[in-house]
Amino acid sequence: MLHYAVVFLVIALVAALFGFGGIAAGAVGIAKILFFVFVIMAVVTFVLSLLKRG
């Protein structure tokens, strides 16, 4: 499950690169939304993996 948290974090960082960096001007809004969605998914998955271990 920790693997998924890392994957979601990487996807969020890539979305942030496109959304906040201004690389893809047409997709800025979508990239910003995806960034926050995947950050939330990464945090939730990380917390669930900690709860599963403990």
UniProtKB/Swiss-Prot annotation:
Q: What is its main location?
A: membrane
Q: Which UniProt keywords apply?
A: Cell membrane, Membrane, Transmembrane, Transmembrane helix
What membrane topology does the UniProt entry give? Multi-pass membrane protein
What is the residue range of the signal peptide feature?
none
Q: Does the keyword Transmembrane helix apply?
A: yes
What does the UniProt entry say about where the protein is found? Cell membrane
Q: Name one Pfam family in it.
A: DUF1328
Which Gene Ontology cellular-component terms appear in the entry?
A: plasma membrane
Mark the transmembrane ranges: 5-25, 28-48
Q: Name the family.
A: Belongs to the UPF0391 family.
> What name goes with this protein?
UPF0391 membrane protein Ajs_3511
Species the sequence originates in: Acidovorax sp. (strain JS42)
User: The organism's lineage?
Assistant: Bacteria, Pseudomonadati, Pseudomonadota, Betaproteobacteria, Burkholderiales
